[in-house]
């Protein structure tokens, strides 16, 4: 099983791109999703389960401290992502949007971290994630980015809302 996981995500202006992560799930995790869909603890375009059985023990550690996201620095270097911007959703989750305004979160470049990650992370539902993403896009600037980057360090170190 390769250490890197590549998944199609939705980027700026709904353009798909290949996002890199360290693998944190067992093989055939996507096939298993249908069997555990009823345990989804989120809504809309998000699929979150606190004790997701598809995640390996090492994967749980990597996710707890967001270390699985490190390969996305390659996406930043390639110009597909920026440090701060709305997190890109997997294409499958993207197709679950249920209100037209939710798509407006794709008017900016996707980022490694974002306002909703430092405001609750996985504890926020899809609707509030979109509200924070749209707020960020309408108010973004270097000072807001700096605040989000600094808060990200705190959130990651203390694993706030990580699962």
Each model region followed by its residue ranges:
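Conserved small/aromatic sequence motifs within transmembrane helices
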Residues: 1-163
């Amino acid at each position: 099983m390769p250490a890197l996981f590549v998944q199609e995500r939705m980027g700026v202006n709904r353009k798909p791109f290949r996002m890199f992560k360290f693998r944190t799930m067992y093989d055939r995790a996507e096939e298993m999703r249908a069997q555990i869909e009823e345990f989804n603890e989120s809504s809309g375009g998000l699929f979150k389960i606190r004790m997701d059985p598809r995640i390996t023990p090492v994967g749980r550690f990597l996710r707890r401290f967001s270390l699985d996201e490190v390969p996305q620095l390659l996406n930043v270097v390639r110009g597909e992502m920026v440090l701060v911007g709305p997190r890109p959703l997997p294409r499958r989750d993207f197709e679950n949007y249920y209100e037209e305004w939710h798509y407006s979160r794709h008017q900016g470049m996707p980022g490694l971290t974002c306002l909703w990650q430092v405001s609750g992370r996985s504890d926020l539902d899809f609707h509030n994630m979109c509200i924070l993403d749209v707020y960020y896009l309408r108010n973004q600037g270097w000072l807001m980015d700096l605040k989000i980057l600094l808060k990200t360090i705190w959130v990651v170190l203390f694993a706030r809302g990580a699962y």
